[in-house]
């Protein structure tokens, strides 16, 4: 049995940083080392209107919740903020067009409506990329931890950040709970050992 109280007190290091969108989403090494869709996370569910509203919030400089990561060696896993992370990524890659219905303050500006990131003026692209986002990174203080401890820490962080903030659907909670049952752990361990 994993003693989370001891682990969080003695083994976990928590670091809060402020990172530019540029450093998180245009750095190929960082992108390749970031898993933003771990198995316990729900799928990407934001429609284009909601995604546009979120991007508009960034342009307006409003405070957005931090992205929560778990770091192991040089790899990162998004524990909380998958919808935000993937929306920014899709926008920067040019896969998201800003919809007028999602632009509550910038909707009257022809500089934004119907455009993807690559179609924006250089001024707006630079402004977006320089925007700072808070990140919280959890990691183990040393290399002496088990896979069971790592999985327990990730589940605990995920459950705490998702308890009441943006309620998950019951099937999403069931999925997260299923991933910690003994049978699933057994298969995960044995498949990884092969």
Model-derived features: positions:
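Acidic, carboxylate-rich catalytic segments that either coordinate divalent cations
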Residues: 1-24, 28-32
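Basic- and aromatic-enriched surface patches that contact anionic nucleotides/nucleic acids
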Residues: 3-15, 38-194
């Amino acid at each position: 049995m994993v003693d989370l109280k001891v682990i969080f007190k003695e083994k976990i290091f928590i670091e809060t940083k402020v990172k530019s969108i540029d450093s998180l989403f245009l750095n190929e090494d960082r992108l390749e080392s970031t898993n933003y869709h771990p198995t316990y996370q729900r799928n990407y569910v934001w429609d284009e209107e909601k995604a546009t509203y979120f991007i508009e919030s960034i342009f307006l400089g409003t405070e957005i919740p931090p992205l929560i990561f778990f770091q192991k060696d040089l790899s990162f896993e998004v524990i909380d903020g998958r919808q935000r992370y993937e929306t920014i990524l899709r926008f920067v890659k040019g896969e998201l067009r800003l919809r007028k219905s999602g632009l509550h303050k910038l909707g009257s500006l022809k500089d934004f409506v119907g455009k993807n990131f690559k179609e924006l003026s250089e001024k707006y692209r630079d402004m977006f990329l320089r925007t700072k986002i808070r990140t919280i990174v959890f990691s183990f203080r040393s290399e002496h931890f088990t896979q069971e401890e790592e999985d327990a820490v990730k589940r605990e962080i995920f459950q705490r950040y998702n308890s009441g903030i943006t309620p998950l659907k019951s099937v999403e909670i069931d999925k997260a709970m299923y991933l910690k049952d003994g049978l699933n752990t057994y298969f995960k361990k044995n498949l990884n050992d092969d």
